[in-house]
Regions:
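NAD(P)-cofactor binding segment of oxidoreductase domains
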Residues: 86-114, 146, 151
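Glycine-rich Rossmann NAD(P)(H)-binding loop
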Residues: 195-200, 225-232, 281
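N-terminal Rossmann NAD(P)H-binding glycine-rich loop of SDR-like oxidoreductase domains
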Residues: 3-26
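NAD(P)H-binding glycine-rich loop region in Rossmannoid oxidoreductase-like domains
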Residues: 51-94
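NAD(P)-dependent short-chain dehydrogenase/reductase
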Residues: 150-201, 208
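Mid/C-terminal beta-alpha module of Rossmann-like enzyme folds, strongest
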Residues: 212, 219-264
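Conserved C-terminal active-site "lid" loop/helix of NAD(P)H-dependent oxidoreductases
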Residues: 234-240, 257-296, 301-303
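Conserved Rossmann-fold NAD(P)-dependent oxidoreductase catalytic core, especially the SDR/UDP-sugar
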Residues: 100-136
């Protein structure tokens, strides 16, 4: 029996590493992980790793045509919102041009193209959002991700778009922090913390997002799907819930307005997603925020 081939981009990122974990022991899948540079996942066996620069169309063409995957899960992107605002050329290259290159080669080999998108395509005036709500990005990052969505919807033969919100989790080498570990570390220092009270999100556990990607792949589900956490909260509530979980002092938390932060890019005030479609079609069911904290703390202890 011919094994189904799945290729992912951005395998050194948080979601990419969780996808490797998820597919690692699946004997029915031939799994190809790609990222720029060396493989940073601790397990090097059981799948193929290939270095891939997604801004190089010749490299994309050569590597993807060689492997001929049945499904491409595209996780690589420039996701730092302020960086995208300051380096618009770099953001366009990674978030728009690379998608055009990938869509072109995906079409040529008849691959199912699964693309990761964001709540930042919305202006945040009427969240939580459904898959059919009208986007209106406030930042250049949001603009690039919406442009990529439109390219996929108009040019790709077989596509899925997975929109997500504020992903948290830990990579295997602990090289990157996340909002939960940052909040815990900041609270433990017992110094005053200024946290915004007027931005609302549905934080998404990286493992849940990986499962959402797998469900879309397994069910060959086409179209747009919201895959996020189920608990909507303000950023200050998020930090307070971390404090409650670890029994840390909440009195050091100062609630501030987001316009006092002088951030380069505008953020949507209220996002979060309605998950009805993903629950009904995919059977997606995310963990609670506290269950997510519990999991990443167990992982950080064993690292």
């Amino acid at each position: 029996m011919k094994l189904k081939k799945i290729l992912i981009t951005g395998s050194n990122g948080l979601l990419g590493q969780k996808l490797i974990d998820l597919y690692l022991n699946n004997k029915d899948i031939e799994f190809i992980a790609t990222a720029k540079g060396k493989n940073r996942h601790p397990t090097q066996q059981g799948y193929v790793y290939t270095s891939l620069d997604i801004t190089n169309p010749d490299e994309i063409n050569k590597i993807i045509r060689y492997h001929k995957p049945d499904c491409i899960i595209h996780t690589a992107a420039m996701t730092n919102v302020d960086q995208c605002e300051e380096d618009r050329e770099g953001a366009k290259l990674l978030n728009i041009d690379a998608v055009e290159y990938l869509v072109s080669v995906a079409n040529s080999i008849h691959a199912h193209f699964i693309h990761l998108s964001t709540d930042f395509i919305f202006d945040g005036t009427s969240g939580p959002y459904t898959e059919t709500d009208t986007p209106s990005p406030l930042s250049f990052y949001g603009e690039t991700k919406l442009t990529a969505e439109n390219i996929i919807r108009t040019q790709c033969k077989k596509w899925s778009i997975i929109r997500t919100v504020l992903v948290y989790g830990i990579v295997h080498d602990m090289s990157r922090s996340n909002i939960v570990l940052w909040a815990k570390g900041a609270l433990e220092k017992r110094q005053p913390l200024n946290i915004v009270h007027d931005q609302y999100r549905s934080p998404t556990l990286a493992e849940d997002l990986a499962i959402g990607c797998q469900l879309v792949e397994q069910k060959n589900a086409e179209g747009i799907f919201n895959i996020s956490g189920k608990d909507q909260m303000s950023i200050v509530e998020l930090v307070e819930r971390v404090a409650d979980f670890f029994d840390l002092d909440k009195s050091i938390i100062n609630k501030v307005s987001s316009n006092t932060l002088n951030q380069v890019a505008k953020r949507p005030p209220i996002t979060g997603f309605n998950l009805e479609k993903s629950r009904e079609i995919l059977g997606y069911e995310p963990r609670s925020f506290e269950e997510g904290i519990q999991l990443i703390m167990q992982q950080s202890i064993t690292k």
